[in-house]
Curated annotation (Swiss-Prot):
This is Glutathione S-transferase P. It comes from Bos taurus (Bovine). Glutathione binds at Y8, R14, W39, K45, Q52, L53, Q65, S66. Conjugation of reduced glutathione to a wide number of exogenous and endogenous hydrophobic electrophiles. Involved in the formation of glutathione conjugates of both prostaglandin A2 (PGA2) and prostaglandin J2 (PGJ2). Participates in the formation of novel hepoxilin regioisomers. Negatively regulates CDK5 activity via p25/p35 translocation to prevent neurodegeneration. The modification N6-acetyllysine is found at K128.
Length: 210
């Protein structure tokens, strides 16, 4: 039986970064898909610590909060930088990813039609810090921090990929980010996952907007 279980809705949402991480690291996991109708009936929602998903099982350990899950996998699978300084930078990057993800989620679920044009116009200022970070690390030819992949790379990659769906030209003025996405997308195990029906058939968001 796989050591990990992801309990989540039938969407990419806040779980695709951890799925990409697990796939790229050669880990197996089980999916428990929760239909919205079942969720709204209440028992599972009431049993969840914060009343929300994802829920993540690692053996006897139950975790909630997607970023806590990513950090846990980072620690257990050696994806948290090579020392404390790199770990601090990985945390900083991941917090930056979360800031932009929250803006994205707000657009998708509360203001898509009225807000998309302004959101896309403002997007370059939110992407620029990641381009800057890449430029400061081996000229942008490696990962976002150091010379080994971290959990923040998977989270950033997911964020960039969903923005390429929202605004296909969003990385045109960011050559390092564009090359970074292409480079990570081509990692053999990750490439296989991204081409799989499990990923391809899973909508990005729960309301059909992307």
């Amino acid at each position: 039986m796989p050591p990990y279980t992801i309990v989540y809705f039938p969407v990419q949402g806040r779980c695709e970064a951890m799925r990409m991480l697990l796939a790229d690291q050669g880990q197996s996991w089980k999916e428990e898909v929760v239909a919205m109708q079942s969720w709204l009936q209440g028992p599972l929602k009431a049993s969840c610590l914060y009343g929300q998903l994802p829920k993540f099982q690692d053996g006897d350990l139950t975790l909630y909060q997607s970023n806590a899950i990513l950090r846990h996998l980072g620690r257990t699978l050696g994806l948290y930088g090579k020392d404390q300084q790199e770990a601090a930078l990985v945390d900083m990057v991941n917090d930056g990813v979360e800031d932009l993800r929250c803006k994205y989620v707000s657009l998708i679920y509360t203001n898509y039609e009225a807000g998309k044009e302004d959101y896309v116009k403002a997007l370059p200022q939110h992407l620029k810090p990641f381009e800057t970070l890449l430029s400061q690390n081996k000229g942008g030819q490696a990962f976002i921090v150091g010379d080994q992949i971290s959990f923040a790379d998977y989270n950033l990659l997911d964020l960039l990929r969903i923005h390429q769906v929202l605004a296909p030209s969003c990385l045109d003025s960011f050559p390092l980010l564009s090359a970074y996405v292409a480079r990570l997308n081509s990692r053999p195990k990750l490439k296989a996952f991204l081409a799989s029906p499990e990923h391809m058939n899973r909508p990005i968001n729960g309301n059909g907007k992307q």
